[in-house]
Amino acid sequence: MKRLLIAATALSIMGLPLLANASPKQDLEQFRAYFFKKFPGVKLQDFGNGIYAIDPVRRDEWQNIEEFPPYEAGIDKGKALFNKYGLAKCFKNGGKGIKQNYPYFDSKSGKVHTLIADIQACIVKNGHKPLGLKKGKIAGIAAYMAYTSRGKVQNVVIPNDKRALKIYNRGKTHFYAKRGQLNFSCADCHMYSSGQMARGNLLSPGLGQTSHFPVWRRKWAKKTAAKKGKVGAFGGFGTIERRYGGCNKQVRAKVLNKGKKWKTAQHPEYVALEYFHTSMSNGIKLNGPAVRQ
């Protein structure tokens, strides 16, 4: 960890952070260029496979797991819940094959909509109690919707609207800003130190990260099994909301979505981060849900 701290500090100084006044198009071009240079030979679409695009040994192991994926039961149960809550009538195309367009900016409300938030809104609209947003049922529903969108190309639109750009830039600032006792940013781990080890885990490239959410993590599955005695259909699942909070916790920063208020609602800071973060994977095909470390 000490070596990683030193490397991250040096690389964040030497690296090429995205310009504050750059357009979303310029941001995407620079973001891709950084990773193409850092990992020569890795094609754009392969970045959607996370660490398995940069580590051949881990890739072989992952491919073996994907032959009998542990998330299949979760997809099936997520589909059943999708139907139970009547979600098809709230989404275009009945909620199938639409994840590639999320998050999106709504010009009428001036807000960014995430898939998780729209699922929650529909559940409440249909007279049901809201769900927790980090894991469990909502992660299973999102996993099913992601599965129906596999192969679709990520296409987050950042319109030339001051309100949309303000949210986008808020997320961009969060991605590059250092925080917590470890003084790490998202970019420190997933740009400058990507491909290095930290606490036994290989740090994944930021490019393509959002293409496979919600994810089924072995770490989360083990935690569920230890607590409940079994993993269950949703035990290994987590939304990107869960991952953001976990990352903040790991760098000993304030977890913004912690507490009763944020159990069933998304923190605007994480919405902004998801808007920027996902747009940096535009052009990459969705492949979620997926197994991760």
Label each PLM-derived region with a short phrase.
Residues 152-170:
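Solvent-exposed, charged amphipathic helical/linker segments at domain boundaries
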Residues 23-73, 83-140, 147-151, 157, ...:
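Electron-transfer interface patches adjacent to heme c in soluble/periplasmic c-type cytochromes
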Residues 16-22:
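Sec/Tat signal peptide C-region and signal peptidase I cleavage site
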Residues 73-74, 166:
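An amphipathic alpha-helix/helix-turn recognition signal
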